Amino acid sequence: MKKTFIILSLIFFTSANAAGHMSSKDKEATLACTGLYYANSMIPQGTLKLDKIVHSIASKKFLTSYLIKEGLKEDAINSKLNGFVDELYGKPYDDKKTSNCDKFIYKLIPESKVEIEKLVKSGIY
């Protein structure tokens, strides 16, 4: 009986962890990166290369959908993103922050780089 309980507990906790649920710290960092991508997407095209704007739009779209799948409410996401955009709007493109966000997201979310690249190539963002 004790052995069965331990085995079932291990299976439950392993599968719960394997489902990819994010910690609150990871959710906040992902929201911050999504806000950065959103603000980057509003930088005028003449100021920033089009490929960086398109990457930002696709990343924002992918991450917003991902956060909704993770259980965050769309209104809460939009509210947070608006706060980040208010803070970052009008500031120049920060290559270092954007690169750090890319690395963080690609490491945190399996296949995120591939999915974002698909969005970029599809032209649907």
Segments predicted by a language model, with ranges:
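Sec-dependent N-terminal signal peptides
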Residues: 4-15
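Processing junctions and N-termini across compartments
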Residues: 12, 27, 94-95
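Generic detector of short alpha-helix boundary/capping microenvironments
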Residues: 6, 21-22, 89
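Boundary at the C-terminal end of the N-terminal hydrophobic targeting segment
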Residues: 16-20
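Compact alpha-helical subdomains of small soluble proteins
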Residues: 51-125
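Short N-proximal segments of mature Sec-exported proteins
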Residues: 22-72
